[in-house]
Swiss-Prot record:
Domain of life (superkingdom): Eukaryota
Compartments it resides in: Secreted
Propeptide residue interval(s): 21-50
Cellular compartments per GO CC: extracellular region
Domain comment as written in the entry: The cysteine framework is C-C.
Protein family (similarity comment): Belongs to the conotoxin L superfamily.
Post-translational modification: Contains 2 disulfide bonds.
Name of the featured protein: Conotoxin ba14a
GO molecular function, a single term: toxin activity
Tissue distribution of the protein: Expressed by the venom duct.
Signal peptide interval: 1-20
Annotated disulfide bonds: none
Swiss-Prot/TrEMBL keywords: Disulfide bond, Secreted, Signal, Toxin
Length: 68
């Protein structure tokens, strides 16, 4: 009886600790928090990132800022 209760408690605690990982992974594939505390929007929980590509590059850009 004691062993099963301890197992259930350990399972619940481990699930609650890993609950935030899938949500962070959905937001741009980033799991680790950015350095700035203001980098995540508290209402939408999405990470704010600035785009370095020019606006006319719809498919993204290379490192030298040329469109793909």
């Amino acid at each position: 009886m004691k062993l099963s209760v301890m197992f259930i408690v350990a399972l619940v605690l481990s699930l609650s600790m890993t609950d935030g990982l899938p949500r962070r992974a959905e937001n741009g594939g980033r799991i680790f928090r950015q350095h700035s505390p203001d980098s995540m929007d508290p209402q939408t929980r999405q990470i704010k990132t600035r785009t370095l590509c020019p606006e006319h590059c719809t498919n993204g850009c290379n490192m030298d800022m040329t469109c793909i």
